[in-house]
């Protein structure tokens, strides 16, 4: 909140003039590129039919044969998942993995001849699907008498890569996986350093993994990357590859059509003219939500949640950049009451505009739902109210030029990051029997998995923007608050926050193991929101300053089809 009020006297009359910020955010880089995209229903149906036909072939070829050994079947499942096709074969994959789990873990059957790659792959796939497998039981045999990973493993590059990926499924206190991560990172980095060319498939995989392991990668981006690698493997399955390409391009067409509709909503609402001080990032916001769920059946959910996150972004800029504290108090109170008849109490006009658009949109969400599901919107409203209360608290810190303690900061900032609001709101448009009132009640509590995802969101945002925030003299970040409470240097604060981010990932992994508090397809949204933070905030704030990461991601998922 950078608004100031200047007072001057003239003929015994005090005149107050509000100085609004003159700084403007980077303009949108996409223009109206997505506004006019269209694809006929006939063309979509044709593409869907092609995908359905190939799906049946794949079912028979891969999941219809029960004679394969465990190693072979795990590798097939891995390829299917990495090609982005797992959502087509959820029950088949789950059945196969449950069978493998019962054979190799549930009945204490030890695969003594299992190599490092196979053991790591088995562990990773089972953990990804919520099976509670013991890391020491699987990986202790790869250690020497001194408790270190055997030196002979250094030459097994494929095994090292597989172990590296598996280590990112660790839970709190799994020391053997922490050691595995350090061991594999060191030797995979050395492998690349000793190679003059990095164009071969293995080197490309290692480079990608070191930048972003599979556990932290958005599924569609990872699929796009792997399809090109898999195509260059001499032993690739042609039917699988063909299905992966067709499916990717089909989903891209569906997503582009959705983005076109969202872009028209943004343009017709005239938000750019009504809120010229705010970031115009509707394409990036849609990408954010696409990261949470890409499957075709969640089209309505994406539409609803993109609009909600757009309002959250507008509110963020109102509270951070534009409004006076008195205006922010008025808006917070009005949203708390959620009553269109009090709109006249909001001044200046931009507050009325925001309030009216917000309430009208949530009313439209209710109208789009069956009557028995309209209760969902109530839970989303409550989280949005909570979000604005946290924004107001942070605005007060800035107004008072106050740096809170780290503990006090966390109470507010883990709400103001917006992830609790988004996670609850993400269920509004999900057409699924697993979304019930009990699920909303469960998610509305302070759950460990939501707190962990919010921690990743808040700390990665703060670390990415710390220098920028300091130059703007904006509200304090986790860095200043940690330094203040614990009397440490900036570098020490950075190290501690990064440790807490790593620990939060482990907590998410643990919360996704069976039995879960609510159905896994719901909790996966929490995981996916965390993945997006790693993409957009690992090397800076790619939302506010749209650069290569954002541009490449949008191009890969929403512009360029796979040939």
UniProtKB/Swiss-Prot annotation:
It catalyses: (2E,6E)-farnesyl diphosphate = alpha-humulene + diphosphate. One of its GO terms (biological process) is diterpenoid biosynthetic process. Mg(2+) 3 binds at residues 461, 469. Keywords: Lyase, Magnesium, Metal-binding. Its EC number is 4.2.3.104. Expressed in trichomes, cones and young leaves. Binds 3 Mg(2+) or Mn(2+) ions per subunit. Mg(2+) 2 binds at residues 316, 320. The keyword Nucleotide-binding does not apply. The keyword NAD does not apply. CDD domains: Terpene_cyclase_plant_C1. It is an enzyme of class 4 (lyase). GO terms for molecular function: alpha-humulene synthase activity; magnesium ion binding. Mg(2+) 1 binds at residues 316, 320. The Asp-Asp-Xaa-Xaa-Asp/Glu (DDXXD/E) motif is important for the catalytic activity, presumably through binding to Mg(2+). Belongs to the terpene synthase family. Tpsa subfamily. Sesquiterpene synthase that catalyzes the formation of alpha-humulene. Can use farnesyl diphosphate (FPP) as substrate, but not geranyl diphosphate (GPP) or geranylgeranyl diphosphate (GGPP). This is Alpha-humulene synthase. It comes from Humulus lupulus. The lineage of its organism: Eukaryota, Viridiplantae, Streptophyta, Embryophyta, Tracheophyta.
